[in-house]
């Protein structure tokens, strides 16, 4: 008697069908997984801005003024608002290093254990542009947006440390902090401490819920590749007398990529570098051009007037915090008014912003209280 053995298993066709189904499922699920990850990163970015806003309020409670955007006085080196709030973002150790001075210099960039005993730093005088200062390499999650792919802090000379968060100058374009009187021309809540020049919350007559405090700006990416935004800064746009320099900046924008300049433009990789430096090109932003668009500076010097535009790796807009501590997501299509307006007509003066709703939420006391976002 002949017995037959029945075999169980997939035929080649069945196996290919199963593989195809699995591939389709992965294709359907992967975007959802990526979207969930980005949502988590965006939420963390929001929390970072909330923490920075709370730290600024705590600083105000202790010192009776908003942290200066930069220091330009006999006590401090040219440090930024981020340095001043270190004790309020759980970074007292880094602040104490900066405040006490001593053996802060490193023989190996980014290696705090490589301190040099032959080169001391005076208290409060560590220079924010020097790569070999130990406290500039503090690990501070609140200064980095997790969606930014730029990687670890830079240890390059002149560019130690990075940050995604900046303080508001409003719609003013002003020269850098060590030029003294220009520090008073900020139309936002921040100003430069030129030896006693400070602002408190009473300065914000437009309302703390209507006035920006912080926003994110992508760092100059080092990864390369298709996800790498061109985040350089166009230099030398005002070699002549051209008051419409916001529209001049837009004129160099790549028509196929609003984040980039046309290839002939000379740029500098300054965005997101030197988190401890109070110079405006490193520490602040302006509400002049739409979020996620280009950046320009008056000349080839990082000390000159600049337009730094908030932007992000979040799709469609940018996270910002207001002076009341709230955080919102602002669309890159927000009303930005007239980019051809002469910025000199508003810099350091009163009057409503010519740059639409975007400019209005940048000003602190321009009589712009009826704002709808």
Regions found by a protein language model. Name each.
Residues 1-5:
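N-terminal secretory signal peptides that target proteins for export/translocation
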Residues 7-41, 45, 51:
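N-terminal single-pass transmembrane signal-anchor helix
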Residues 35-373:
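Internal low-complexity, small-residue/proline-rich segments
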